[in-house]
Design a protein with these regions (language model features):
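Alpha-helical lid/collar subdomain of P-loop NTPases
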Residues: 8, 121, 154, 159-160, ...
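AAA+ P-loop NTPase catalytic core and its hallmark functional loops
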Residues: 1-174, 178, 240-244
């Protein structure tokens, strides 16, 4: 599906929980398509100038410096905006001319209009869970993207990933995945973020280095998820029940 979107110059939105593999997926697709990848981590202070570029003062005057979005447009790269809803709406709106038939990037400060080079593609990602409780994309922006839904892989596949990436044996990997699935069931009980595959891999790497399994789970999985004493207690109980 992603390859077809790229071939037809369609912008893509990757939707899924934190740590489920969205960034790894886009890195793989850029490699598979043979395109350079420009990654931008979005945040509240990200401005249009941070994306497009700005004039810099030099000893002999001023010089224009392209931002990462402009470089991607010129080079025909895949431009990946990670967690796009963290950016302000007045920043996101500069993407609109690149997501329709025009495929252009107007640069007001220089008066230049850049036509996207062959191979350019705009890709954004966001977490539709916790982020929608705080902020969301405008409908006028959402409808410019083809949406691909992501989720955590099935248990056996996730265990294989944890074993490979974390370096633990399959039995420990299955235990970590089982713990992760139990903890994900706490989302409706006040847990804002569920444990990602990334957290399970972090715990696996600690275990590989010789850290006891329960302690590795506490510091790599339980503590990053919550500061609420009651939730921490419930999660620690699940760890103890999983690795008896």
């Amino acid at each position: 599906m992603f390859e077809q979107c790229h071939a037809r110059n369609l912008a893509v939105m990757l939707k899924g929980p934190t740590g489920c593999g969205k960034t790894r997926f886009i890195e793989f697709m850029a490699w598979r398509l043979g395109r350079p990848l420009v990654t931008i981590s979005c945040h509240d202070d990200l401005t249009a100038s941070d994306l497009i570029g700005r004039f810099l003062i030099r000893h002999d005057g001023t010089a224009w410096q392209d931002g990462p979005l402009t470089r991607a447009v010129r080079e025909g790269a895949i431009c990946y905006l990670d967690e796009v809803v963290e950016a302000r709406q007045d920043t996101v709106v500069v993407l609109h001319p690149l997501t329709d038939y025009r495929r252009i990037l107007p640069i007001d400060k220089t008066g230049e209009t850049i036509h996207a080079a062959e191979g350019f593609q705009l890709v954004v990602s966001y977490n539709p869970g916790y982020q929608r409780m705080l902020k969301d994309m405008k409908p006028s922006t959402r409808q410019r993207f083809v949406a691909l839904d992501f989720n955590f892989p099935p248990a056996e596949r996730e265990a294989a990933i944890v074993a490979h990436e974390g370096g633990v044996d399959p039995t420990v990997a299955r235990g970590l995945v089982g713990l992760g699935q139990r903890l994900r069931g706490l989302q409706d009980r006040g847990l804002a973020e569920v444990p990602s595959t990334r957290l399970l891999i972090a715990a696996a790497r600690l275990i590989t280095s010789g850290i006891p399994v329960p302690l590795a789970c506490y510091v790599a999985i339980v503590s990053p998820l919550s500061d609420e004493p009651s939730l921490i207690g419930a999660m620690r109980d699940l760890v103890d029940a999983t690795f008896v």
